[in-house]
Amino acid sequence: MGELLWTPPTDVREKSRIGDYLRWLRAERSLDFADYDELWQWSVSDLAGFWRSIWDYFDVRAYDQPTATLSDPTMPGARWFPGATLNYAEHVLRMPSRADADPIVVAHSQTRAPVTLTTAELREQVRRVRAGLRRLGVGRGDRVAAYAPNIPETFVLLLATTSLGAIFSSCAPEFGTRSVTDRWQQIEPKVLVAVDGYRYGDKPIDRRAEVVAIRTALPSVVHTVMLPYLDPNAAPPAGTSTWAELAGETDAALEFEPVPFDHPLYVLYSSGTTGLPKPIVHGHGGILLEHLKMLALHHDLGPADRFFWFSTTGWMMWNFLVSGPAVGATIVLFDGNPAVRAEPGKPAEPDLGSLWRLAADTGTTYFGTSAPFLLACRKADLRPGETVDLSALRGLGSTGAPLPAEGFTWVYDAVGRDLQLQSLSGGTDVCTGFVGGVPLLPVYAGEITCRALGARVEARSTEGKAVVGELGELVITAPMPSMPVGFWNDPDGRRYREAYFDVYPGVWRHGDWITISERGGCVITGRSDATLNRGGVRLGTAEFYSVVETLDEVVDSVVVHLEDAEGGAGDLLLFVVLADGLELDDTLRARIARELRTALSPRHVPDEIHQVRAVPRTLSAKKLEVPVKKILTGTPVDSAAATGALANPESLVAFERFARERTGH
């Protein structure tokens, strides 16, 4: 058990949104729960009762009422709220308990001055852009694609598109042409909205050539709308219109197309590290219910909050963030390089304090980021709680990778002792976290607090049995409304079934190793398909990184295990990226081995340690352990990884060269 770092206040039930929900359950459903575990058990055993309570508690507006809550619980293909019609955008724009003049979007950027939208201004912009899309012929089922960053216009476009019953999809503008076309050629968008470029730190990035290449590769695009972001005075290329024209004056009312509960809302994509990215279709109703539940009951967000999560439009956390107004929360957007201080007219300087200053300047109450960012701040010995005013901050979220115990202790030592740290894990596949935090439970170092309401998460042994207190495969044994409607262009559902249900029929296999404790806390130790198996003992990759990357000399690392075809122990290989100017020598190798042996076990000591310039990562910063392993076992680079999905595809060359040298081929 990790160190106890935070305990809920004694009046948590009186002051939290989940406390209010519990009182509502008592009054409206005659249900009384002594603690979170009882509530969770009910939420995953009476699925229809729980999800109908979410619908009713949050007063979901339906044009046609559902004939049932869950008419078919079979996975895949569970049928939620049949007969219901509603619209996601309408619920986001309800912005409960917010006045017209209240700020609802606060956006900071390294490309332009800050922008704030009030609730009235947001509705007005959505009204105009909705009318503009209709003028372009966009209607129900059409796809609208955004090659745009985390700025208010992208959020407005999402709401305008989905208000029409059209389907939204975004790629961040740092995505290269191949990465974008691999995604959008699958869904064939009718309209493309694209920025001319952006600024990353003090570096201008012109994307006009990429936009031309993307348009050329997408014959389905009938209209291209240019958003002059890098250069506000830039003339639009021939054959395109402008954002100002799209958002022009109109008498058209702001209306919302009623669509079925499972009508496609947006298409997100798997990382696409091997083959084409999987186009994951999410539905209006499932995303709405899941985000209402998570944002209000787990993150405790409401009209008094300012909610920030560092994300680009190419990561599902952006979609999660921008649902914030549905629970009344103001959202804080940031576009730029989080690791530099960039001021107009001055060269950018390395500085991990930028996001903390943003939180202070905007009065952020809930700060979301990634585990690698928190660990980088710890390594740089930042103490943001002492250097900027974070007095408004009461919640901090971490995701993207497991957060080790030392990351937890750094937050409580250097950021604030009174905030609740919520480490959460989920995926693009469900556009949420299915394990995370909740105001009712304490925080222990290195441990995800609980399984989320409505998420029947289990750890399964190699024999397929549910286990407690030991490592197992993370599975979900009951449907969730935000599971995908399906994959795009997968009419028989084969690709969808193969992705999640091929190992355990009728049970969602997520691909992570998880340990669930007796009290319900969770520890995720890495991807199950990247497992290290030493003498029959499974080792998670995350624990390696938590030790190796705390060393001052090590900037990044990746570990893989190469099995012995004849049944031997195989080889455990560790690759490290060192700080500038350092070379790996036997002294540092010995120190790394010693740290792993002492902190973990002798089994964790690599057979070989090698230096590389960079660890391959996806565009959402995830390490590519499986493709590295494939390359090291002889798979050609082009077959092992879709290079368009990588932030640094050139990093694969070193592993290919290493494989040749190692095998002599």
Give names to the regions the model predicted.
Residues 38-42, 89, 105-158, 176-181, ...:
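Conserved AMP-binding/adenylate-forming core of the ANL superfamily
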Residues 101-103, 224-226, 237-269, 276, ...:
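Conserved pre-ATP/AMP-binding loop-to-beta segment of ANL
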Residues 149, 191-210, 231, 335-338, ...:
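Adenylate-forming
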Residues 159, 163-245, 370-371:
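Structural core segment of the AMP-binding/adenylate-forming
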Residues 223, 558-564, 573-574, 593-665:
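Conserved C-terminal "lid"/linker of ANL adenylate-forming enzymes
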Residues 288-306, 314-365, 380-382:
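Conserved AMP-binding/adenylation subdomain of ANL enzymes
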Residues 297, 394-521, 527-531, 544:
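Conserved AMP-binding/adenylate-forming
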